[in-house]
């Protein structure tokens, strides 16, 4: 290879990342117009398009590099020099941390995820002490109640870039003040002030105002979801001021926000104060930088591994028929491998399973489906694998594993947030906790269905409970669109003997689902059955599901709320409008 080619390659990769992030910002910047025009289908399409941008631009750069090198192989020393040149380009680069991840992605695409070492990749950042340099403009603006909270909130809402009229701004301000007074107390409120992010955070059918509420006792989140009526008038739906509420809004089971962030590291640092329970990976994920979030997630895993003497074990819960799941006892994530062979009743391929996981990545997860990170050639130290798990890996997924002596390489796996399996949770709780869990499960099914997702396998074992008590779906191998399912009523038995027969007396075609059958496995436990019948009996009726299908086919996009219905101002303080979207 001619000298100087290393610098050209390094510059080509960085220019490719510039192009990718420029398009990322371009798609993001259209969020306001999509919201104002209530173009909800365009919102969904933009979300998918933005996710695809990264891999598309990695592919473009890889093709450029193959042209530059004329398809010739490059030795290790050459690649190390490329990385050295790339590193020298980053000290004054505003998005250096994501540029490092982009370099990693290009390398992995070129070399098929082989030879992934710290020398060749940015497994750890080249600038670990650096956060960000001078910010060209402030990320947020401060508002003080010098003339009272009514004036302060009027200034905040009037400063928003939204071009739609307000339905009743004064009313919304009264509601916000009422909430703050209830939360903080009338005496404390005059001694508080607010800092509000300059950019709105768009997701689904809401524009979120994200801020920090500084009180005499510390800093709290200040979140206002702004919705629009069918007539195009704005209203504030609620006010959230606890870290738990903010954590759910920015949760791992939700779609990524569309927020204009030319300096994502600066925004992540700003958000950290009101989301103290979120890791760096989770914060990058929330603002849509999912590939860099994967890098940060892997770094968090390596740091945990370095400080722990735990062994990998099979994850608690009922063993899956498609996925082999393992974890570290104290780690908050699980590792999922597609088995080489599935149980006989699972008539599908590994490619189908991967397609299901990709569907979830691109779809609106409505707070009910866990996000995943996908890895190839994942290396584990044999000394850190429990013998029982090692035997299970060799039994269930031998084709996915390469033995390198002291290590094994897993060809493909997913990493996902660890939750308590719902079936285990239900065994351990009683009273109100049991009731809440059943209510959450039914709500999860409803919200997934309204978002055009049918889980397929609705057994409790396929759902998990988060630390906030929310029920989230995490087993995707039978997932499909609601519009692909044929929901049927079970025909009446022809003879009394029909109901005792081992085979159904009616024909069943692929795609047929009989909701009446859900009752057999969801209500078998006498503690659970009556609660389910009380709260979710309509889930056992085919006409309920067909009505949802009709709404979806007619183009209706349901509202998705990241908070309880009882927290909405319309419920707490009075009706907003007969035309406002309802939950």
From Swiss-Prot:
Q: Which GO terms describe its biological process?
A: glucose metabolic process; glyoxylate cycle; tricarboxylic acid cycle
Name the catalytic site residues: 371
Provide this UniProt record's keywords sorted from A to Z.
Answer: ATP-binding, Cytoplasm, Glyoxylate bypass, Hydrolase, Kinase, Nucleotide-binding, Protein phosphatase, Serine/threonine-protein kinase, Transferase, Tricarboxylic acid cycle
> Which HAMAP family does the record cross-reference, listed alphabetically?
AceK (MF_00747)
What taxonomic lineage is listed for the species of origin? Bacteria, Pseudomonadati, Pseudomonadota, Gammaproteobacteria, Enterobacterales
Cross-referenced InterPro entries = AceK_kinase, AceK_regulatory, Isocitrate_DH_AceK
Q: Where in the cell is it found?
A: Cytoplasm
Example GO molecular function: protein serine/threonine kinase activity
Q: Which Pfam families match?
A: AceK_kinase, AceK_regulatory
Please verify whether the record's keywords include ATP-binding.
yes
Is Zinc-finger given among the entry's keywords? no
Q: Where primarily located?
A: cytoplasm
Please give the GO cellular component terms listed in this UniProt entry: cytoplasm
What's the protein called, per UniProt? Isocitrate dehydrogenase kinase/phosphatase
Catalysed transformations (reactions): L-seryl-[isocitrate dehydrogenase] + ATP = O-phospho-L-seryl-[isocitrate dehydrogenase] + ADP + H(+)
PANTHER family for this protein: ISOCITRATE DEHYDROGENASE KINASE_PHOSPHATASE, PTHR39559
